Amino acid sequence: IPFVEPQAWHRIAAASDDLECYLSFYCKPEDYMAKKYDTRAHSEVLEAVQSGHIKPGRTLDLGCGHGRNALYLASLGHDVTAVDVNNEATQRIQMIADEENYNVRAGYYDINAAALPESETFDFILSTVVFMFLDPDQIPSIIKNMQERTVVGGYNLIVCAMDTEEHPCTMPFPFTFEEGELKNY
């Protein structure tokens, strides 16, 4: 089956009267949500998946925002729980997930509470571009809670602003990680 390069014009011209065609558009999973819903998965999430470390399983997106990571992972077969303090955003995620027939449960959760239900465990917990907006005093409890809710052999992925001598953070975030800080957890 021939592929036409992305963003290229194409035209099918009949060489005879009996030409029959079937045209379908192919899209990589990482591009589908971006093209259809304007929500692209974070590059670190893409890298974790494409490296083979993250396999479909029970996934928690902490601070899911508009669902860029939750929807991408659900499209790959993950069973996703997506939580955020923005109810409008989680309602939109749930609507999209239902339209796409993805296994997603989206709802309200305040990450600062560090109180994920003891009855739930996950293979993969991620939080991208969220920690720098959280209460700095709660970070140790939040990370401990994430670790307690992650199955043995599971993964946690945190993407957060850092403040190092070489690359000082110029934004006035309430929290940034210091170099090597996560080694303490």
Segments and roles (model prediction):
Residues L116-I125:
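A short acidic, Gly/Pro-enriched loop at the edge of an enzyme's catalytic core
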Residues F3, D18-E20:
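Fe(II)/2-oxoglutarate
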Residues H10-A15:
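Short beta-strand His + acidic residue motifs that chelate non-heme Fe in jelly-roll/DSBH
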Residues F124-Q138:
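A short SAM/SAH-binding and catalytic strip from SAM-dependent methyltransferases
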